[in-house]
Design a protein with these regions (language model features):
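Short N-terminal binding/cap micro-motifs at the start of the first secondary-structure element
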Residues: 12-17, 34, 202
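Conserved AdoMet/S-adenosylmethionine-binding subsite of the radical SAM
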Residues: 77-209
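A generic, residue-level signal for flexible/boundary positions that often mark functional hotspots
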Residues: 6, 12-13, 126-129
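Short, functional N-terminal and low-complexity linear motifs
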Residues: 3, 23-29, 119-124, 151
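Short secondary-structure boundary/capping segments within folded domains
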Residues: 14-18, 30, 185
Length: 209
């Protein structure tokens, strides 16, 4: 099996429940959405990646030698991300997905981090609502927000009784993190506020971090 891969690198997890943990990132090329705030434009098209076999991906991941893996994109579910995770069965694998594609059953070593696209993304209508029912307590659902309307959307989804752990992140330059904190506290919302650690440590536009 051949994949289109933008990059494979080792860094620390920049967000979610493993934040700060050393991790190998496998970034697959190609995405079916065009979010307004996308920070990985260089991975939107299939042509942005190079061809790698499953065996080559596994070998490079082992060479980089971290205890966990994040498979991201682009949109990794456009390629067979599950087969990569199965081939890396001795690693805990986080598959980051944009929420528009029906999620397949996951192997034991996988958890999903699924976006729920709010209004500022321009991609809300692309969401596959049934995915909300498939996520479990080990999964993460991420809301990237830019204004009060986005926060209201996030609250509405969270209050449906989802099982996944909800995280709310700011769109940089549109909303201050403290505004999100105030909203979560004022609304007694069962959610975690986060900023992207890698954008604090490095330049927000730097790749391979």
């Amino acid at each position: 099996m051949v994949y289109r891969v933008t990059e494979i690198f080792k860094s620390v997890e920049g967000e979610g429940k493993r934040i700060g943990t050393p991790c190998v990132f496998i970034r697959l090329a190609g995405c079916n959405l065009r979010c307004s705030y996308c920070d990985t434009h260089y991975s939107q098209h299939d042509s942005d990646g190079k061809e790698m076999t499953l065996q080559e991906i596994v070998a490079e991941t082992r060479r980089l030698n971290a205890k966990c893996v994040t498979i991201t994109g682009g949109e990794p579910m456009l390629q067979d991300a599950i087969s990569i995770a199965k081939a890396l069965g001795w690693f805990e694998c986080n598959i980051e997905t944009n929420g528009s594609i029906p999620l397949p059953e996951k192997p034991e070593n996988v958890f999903y981090t699924m976006d729920w696209k709010c209004g500022c993304s321009g991609m809300t209508d692309a969401m596959h609502a049934q995915n909300l029912q498939w996520l479990d307590e080990n999964d993460v659902i991420k809301f990237v927000v830019g204004n009060d309307a986005d926060l209201e959307q996030a609250k509405a989804v969270i209050n449906t009784g989802i099982k996944a752990i909800p995280y709310i992140s700011p769109i940089y330059g549109m909303i201050e993190p403290k505004e999100i904190v105030e909203y979560v506290l004022d609304n007694e919302l069962d959610a975690r506020v986060q900023v992207q650690l890698h954008k604090v440590i490095w330049d927000p536009d730097e790749r391979g971090v």
